Each structure stands twice: as structure tokens, then as C-alpha cells.
């Protein structure tokens, strides 16, 4: 077999390059410096790119900034929840809500104090008008035996009666809400409540604690 000459192959390649790129191409196939790089369709590959580490760092920074922004949107208390899990935040907020709920025992004691203050004011006015008269009602207090036998209930606790809707599920909560609104409207229209609101509240609380 006769081997082909290398000179003929080189001449063919140089002739083909000269046809594609023009006369500025050298015989060895290297382009001249005046060749425009932007005309190359793959020129964007040579542009600087963002590395994987930089992408990961940017994502972490944006995530942390979003968390801080959400924490400061609410109250000033929420700003102290940075770096705390969502479950612990929910527990703390639930505890704060429980502390804000009205307590029946505190309301009863405040009503008793208000009643005692009214009695003291009335007694003092009577004593100023009648110094010689003795008011026996101010010194003698009748105590009901049922009131003495009442068990002490922790403040903030609510007695769950039988045959009542369960507040833990959605259906029971709706039923309880409807009952409470109906009872609230009934209380507002009650004549005893309109005449003496504190006395009516005191009696209702005593009945509920029995």
C-alpha cells in the first residue's frame, strides 16, 4: 500500500480554513487576533460564573434574613424567638394566652372585696349619722354551710360537666360557642343583671363552683 503524503492533507486543511475564515488565517490554522470573539456562539461559556459554594452561601443568607424579618413583624416578644424551634414558640405563645385568660377565683375575690368596701362605706356613713345606734348587720355575718363545705378549686381551672360538648374537637367547639353566645344575650337582657351586674355575677360564679 502506498501511504498518503502528509503535505497534501495539510494543504487541504489550510485551504478549507482559508475559505471559512478569510485570508487572515495563517497556514498553520491559527486565527488572527483581529478575529471577533463575540461572534462565537459559545462565547458566554467564558464569562465568570457563580460557584456552588457562593450559591449555597447566598441561599443561607437569604433564609436567615427572611427568618429575622418574620420574627420582627409581630410583637416585640417575637423578636426574642430567634433560633428557637416552631414547636417551642407555639408552646410559649400558648402559655402566654393561658395567663391572659380570666380566672374565676380572682373574679370572685375581687367581687367579694368590692362588696366589703361597699359595706364599709355604708356602715361608716351610718355611724356618722347615728353615733348612738348600733348596727348589728355590720357586725354579724351569716355564713351558709354550703359555702363552708365548698372544695377549694385551683385558680384558672374550669370544671368540666358531664353531657357537655367537647371543646377539643371542632364540632364541640362550635356547639359551645353557640351556647355561650345565646347565654350571653340572655344575661344582657336579664333584669337582675341590669339592676346589679356585680351581684348577678357573684351568684352565677357561686352556682358554677358548686
UniProtKB/Swiss-Prot annotation:
Its main location: nucleus. It holds the Pfam family SLX9. Residues 10-21 have a biased composition (Polar residues). Keywords: Nucleus, Ribosome biogenesis, rRNA processing. Interacts with the 35S, 23S and 20S pre-rRNAs and with the U3 snoRNA. Belongs to the SLX9 family. Involved in ribosome biogenesis. Required for normal pre-rRNA processing in internal transcribed spacer 1 (ITS1). May be involved in the movements of the replication forks. This is Ribosome biogenesis protein SLX9.
